[in-house]
Amino acid sequence: MTKNSTECSPANQTGLERVLRSPAIAGLVLLVSMLVAFFWVNSPFADSYEAIHHAPAAISIGSFELAKPLILWINEGLMIVFFFLIGLEIKREVFEGQLSSPKQIALPAFAALGGMLVPAAIFLAFNNGSEEYVRGWAVPAATDIVLALALLAMLGSRVPIALKVFLTALAIFDDFGTLVIIALAYSEGLSLPSLLMAALGTLALIVLNRLRVASLTAYVLVGVFVWVSVLESGVHSTLAGVIIAWCIPMRVSGREFLHKIEHDLSPWVALLIVPLFAFFNAGIDLGGVDFETFFGPLGLGIILGLFVGKQVGVMLGVGLAVVLRIGARPIEVSWGHLYGAALLSGVGFTMSLFVAGLAFEQPGAVLTVNLAVVVGSVLSATGGLVVLARSYQTSPSLANAPD
């Protein structure tokens, strides 16, 4: 183990660092952010929330100016950092971690694939006849990696470590699939000149990588250029975060480089960026929700997609991998554990809200979809925690383990 990776290990963290990096704390901050937004927008002070939501903000450099409402800076600017971190995690896992061998990949990969296809199929079964609503097919296919892992962390030693590894890998595959969907399904009006500029920026990042440049500033400056080019190209800007991440070298001069960036960035993303996104997107004004639509095909397609589709799809994927003998269930992980994890994968929250914002433009439809995402996610979270708690009670090896 290199010096930097040792410094980043939990054993070398202070008590405060361990708290700040705790998935449970990240989940709590995220939950509080959503609740504050929800109660604020349904209070007599709702106008002040809307004022913050749509406050104008601009970046000016000489004659160049990029002006957008604050909500778009959060969704298209700060969230790039979130997807950049996901890109770093995927690259690290592919080269050195849980996704570095075919046997390790198969089980969570099949689970993630099933967990995306079945929810999408359920949504389309309800909404295939509606040209307006059919764009939302990817909303129930997403998983909130931060909240799902935070819920699992709440159970501590009551769940085996192998289950945490499985859910992490599943969520990484799920996020990768969501990124591909966003790039292919929600990109419009492509601009060839901007795409060429983005390609040139990416080439510059690759050159920096091959030269093993150790200056993070260099990657940031070129990365901003790539982000602006992608933003102007018509391809959704989230793709820029992953492109930049994959151009970061694993090591420079024998020292950890990618892992250190990931380590330093994680608490900022978990405790600031994701909660900010949740705060700006979870303000659901119940007075503006069309409950006829909520209890109709649109709302039910999302709720059932998240709560039913995710668990069915993940378990079908796991079962298929095991039957085909290309993946194996870890010895210490029971089928009950896997079912609980399958339920937790239905916690869509921030990722589903993000996709919903891309799929729908009408405020009424967005509010209805967001409420359906919250309901489906709460049902999945509750079901997952109950199943995992019962699995702990019926697992002698875990029940006798110290908390």
From Swiss-Prot:
Record organism? Maricaulis maris (strain MCS10)
Gene name, Swiss-Prot/TrEMBL: nhaA
User: Which PANTHER family does this chain map to?
Assistant: NA(+)_H(+) ANTIPORTER NHAA (PTHR30341:SF0), SODIUM ION/PROTON ANTIPORTER NHAA-RELATED (PTHR30341)
**Which taxonomic lineage does the organism of this UniProt entry have?**
Bacteria, Pseudomonadati, Pseudomonadota, Alphaproteobacteria, Maricaulales
List UniProt keywords, sorted A-Z: Antiport, Cell inner membrane, Cell membrane, Ion transport, Membrane, Sodium, Sodium transport, Transmembrane, Transmembrane helix, Transport
The keyword Cell membrane belongs to this UniProt entry's keyword annotation: yes
**Name of the protein:** Na(+)/H(+) antiporter NhaA
Q: What does this protein do?
A: Na(+)/H(+) antiporter that extrudes sodium in exchange for external protons.
> Major place of localization?
membrane
Q: Where in the cell is it found?
A: Cell inner membrane
Catalytic reactions of this protein: Na(+)(in) + 2 H(+)(out) = Na(+)(out) + 2 H(+)(in)
Give any single GO term for biological process: regulation of pH
How does the record say this protein sits in the membrane?
Multi-pass membrane protein
Q: Which NCBIfam families match?
A: NhaA, PRK09560.1, PRK09561.1
